[in-house]
Amino acid sequence: MSEAEASSGMAHNAGPDEKTLQVLRDMANRLRIRSIKATNSSTTSYLIPCSNAEIMSVLFFYTMRYKQEDPENPDNDRCILSKGLPFVNVATGWPGQGLGAACGMAYTGKYFDQASYRVFCLLGDEESTEGSVWEAFAFASYYNLDNLMAIFDVNRIGHSSSMSVEHCIAIYQKRCEAFGWNTYVVDGRDVKTLCHVFSQAAQVRGKPTAVVAKTFKARGMPNVEDAESWYGRPMPKERADAIVKLIESQIQTNKILVPSPPIEDSPQINIMNICMTSPPVYVADDKVSTQRACGLALAKLGHENDRVIVLGSDTKNCNFSDIFKKEHPERFIQCCIAEQNMVNVALGCSTRDRTIVFAYSFAAFFTRAFDQIRLGAISQININLIGCHCGVSTGDDNPYHMALEDLAMFRAIPNCVVFYPSDAVSTEHAVYLAANTKEMCFIRTSQAETAIIYTTQETFQIGQAKVVRHSDNDKVIVIGAGVTLHEALVAAAELSKEDISIRVIDLFTIKPLDIATIISNAKATGGRIITVEDHYPEGGIGGAVCAAVSMEPNIVVHNLAVMDVPRSGRCNEALDFSGISSRHIIVAVKCILMT
């Protein structure tokens, strides 16, 4: 045992009596029975709860404080498992994601809510091979999350074979302690010890707690317990019925335990309907990158509501999130270069509507966290992700930093709103709209400094495009966003000198797409559309527009996109090299008019 055992005072002063311990054992066996019946009714058999039944019994009916009738109560203790259930706010899916979300919940409880609720996360031993687990371990230790407990269910069996370290509990203990966690080693079947350790952990200050519990897969099931051959296999009904009867014979009481009520000390908050109390302050002659405008907008938003928080991955000096940090230092969370954990922490912070979360990093690096992002959508979590350094317009940076796949990635996420602002004014509106949107949002920003297109009085809506240049003589529509919109406007000005008029549309949101505006303007210009995007052709603006007009006769779409791996260079050189500069737009317009 660790130093925590020397602490005096326990959450349950005298510990549980023998009657309570027996009830906890009986409840664990009822969990086993329900697990067997539930999994045996499907075509596979994942008897995971059989190994951790005692842990769950003690956790939910002795240690945790919550109101059963009010699972979303902000004062309830939190628990992270692998399903999105009333008491489990985050779907974690494939192993390795739950602890990061638990870190976000614990950080919110300790530093933002400053409340008494605690956070518990149950992990399988197989999860310990995931790097994201240790990203979370480092985060929790650095921020002294003493309201967080991670419980390892070490049953030694993985999906297809035993774990490499099997039941070498000391290895898990050393790893946890190396990250600065208060660590206990316990027999996961011993409810008395579990009660004692869980209570002692509540007294530890200044560091998170890890409980390494030795357990056995399919615990309590003769000829199945600790066997490697049963993972994922359906169990014959006769055997399952016999095992259920055996476990039922071990239950001595029908009593149940009622959890202790939570300590009601979470603050009342309001994160709804945040208004832009003053318009953007840019003037027509300004040249501002959208990622700088995003940093300024976040800082401004932070003054509108004190529950706005920003998470960074050690890129604040590159993407201007340091502006927010300077003005609201207590609400900026440095997650370091650990993007998977940053997204998981963001998911945890946003649960139960306790904060308005923005996670800001290079858009290219969000590819590392795609699994976390897609599971955030499954959990229906409201987080806002901001990607900077998008496209070849990043220029002098190398291709590794140039996000050219991000639109495809976020367009594939269900119910995700994808913003692509083209100037500082529209960027500020995108930030405020995202803050008020109860779905996942992605804001795509660029490094290139661009002109101000819109007046400070312009209004924006999700799914509403802007026709920024038009005339009655327009022959072609050019659709762009971000830097390519500016290239389209340059091309339009040059073409006008040759008496060629084109219409220019700014999409603003790529998802949802303003299909009505696209189709109506296409019909008014002879059904000719050119899309221009600082993105690979797959999954970007061109694909979205093609899908939108696919059922419309007599509309033709030509797509200009980055067709190959880019090179470093000045912004204008990179755009021209990739075939998406104003020069290439002019050529495309003339070609389409000749056909």
From Swiss-Prot:
Domain of life: Eukaryota
Cofactor note: Binds 1 Mg(2+) ion per subunit. Can also utilize other divalent metal cations, such as Ca(2+), Mn(2+) and Co(2+).
Entry keyword set: Calcium, Cytoplasm, Magnesium, Metal-binding, Thiamine pyrophosphate, Transferase
Major subcellular site: cytoplasm
Distribution of this protein across tissues and organs: Not expressed in the embryonic neocortex.
EC number(s) given by UniProt: 2.2.1.1
Active site: E339 (proton donor)
Binding of thiamine diphosphate, residues: G93, W94, P95, N155, K217, E339, F365, H401
Reaction catalysis annotation: D-sedoheptulose 7-phosphate + D-glyceraldehyde 3-phosphate = aldehydo-D-ribose 5-phosphate + D-xylulose 5-phosphate
Keyword Oxidoreductase listed: no
Record-linked CDD domains: TPP_PYR_DXS_TK_like
GO CC terms: cytosol
InterPro entries in the record: THDP-binding (IPR029061), Transketo_C/PFOR_II (IPR009014), Transketolase-like (IPR051424), Transketolase-like_Pyr-bd (IPR005475), Transketolase_C (IPR033248), Transketolase_N (IPR005474)
Biological function: Catalyzes the transfer of a two-carbon ketol group from a ketose donor to an aldose acceptor, via a covalent intermediate with the cofactor thiamine pyrophosphate.
Quaternary structure note: Homodimer.
Record family assignment: Belongs to the transketolase family.
Name of the protein described by the UniProt record: Transketolase-like protein 1
Organism: Mus musculus (Mouse)
Gene: Tktl1
